Amino acid sequence: MPQEFPAIRLVALDLDGTLLNREGHVTPRTRAALQAAVDKGVYIVPATGRPLASLPPEVAQLPGIRYVITCNGAAVWDLGADPVGAVYSRYSNAKEHRTSTPVCLLHSLMPVETAREAFAVCESCHADLRIFSDGYACTDAHSIALAAARAAQKDSTEARQPNDGRFTILRDAAEWMSRNAFAIEKLCVFFEDPQQAAAALPRFYAVPGVEVVQGSPKNVEVTAAGVDKGEAL
């Protein structure tokens, strides 16, 4: 007899290169497939390395979206009845949008001293640095300038995100870290080329108590040890 499998209850989807096409959009075919799954009672759960603020509104508007795994599994959010408003709540220009309050169901933060040590390595790279904290995508003016220059190179959809308010621009990232090292979900550095990223990897691996991965050959992502999307699921 053919083996019977239990009905699918949940579909977890990465964003870049999976749910999103190369232009950073959800295709009509994908949208229709998701709607068919939702009609059968299946949960659709985006699982991404991005923070909540960087979940595209186009994704938050998809049918069935309520729960989302962010920062490689460092945070799991319940977006409630207004997923788009929950995402906008983490924008720097949140007052310009209708917002709602998301609930964090799981938070696996970096230990304070670990976050400080990892941040010091990030700073020494003099590259495009992103700090993810409480759903916010924090960066600085130098990093935004590097990101703008890189956008023309058609890097990954994550690296080419528009600055539409989803980024919180810090005047001084080091000073901010001195006050908020206790609340770090993830640190992410985008380099100019894969060789620079590969050269930096050993220094990140040397930091005790971290998980180090690469979402693309040009970046390095750091979270607390043990954090991954599978554990979050």
PLM feature spans:
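Conserved acidic, metal-coordinating active-site core of Asp-based
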Residues: 125-128, 132-233
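Flexible loop residues that form catalytic
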Residues: 16, 73, 192
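Mg2+-dependent phosphoryl-transfer enzymes with acidic/Ser/Thr/Gly-rich catalytic loops
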Residues: 2-10, 26-28, 39, 205, ...
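Short alpha-helical
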Residues: 25, 53-54, 195, 228
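Active-site phosphate-binding/coordination module
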Residues: 28-152
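Structured loop/turn residues at beta-strand edges in well-structured enzyme cores
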Residues: 6, 63-64, 182
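Asp-based phosphoryl-transfer active-site loop
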Residues: 7-23, 118
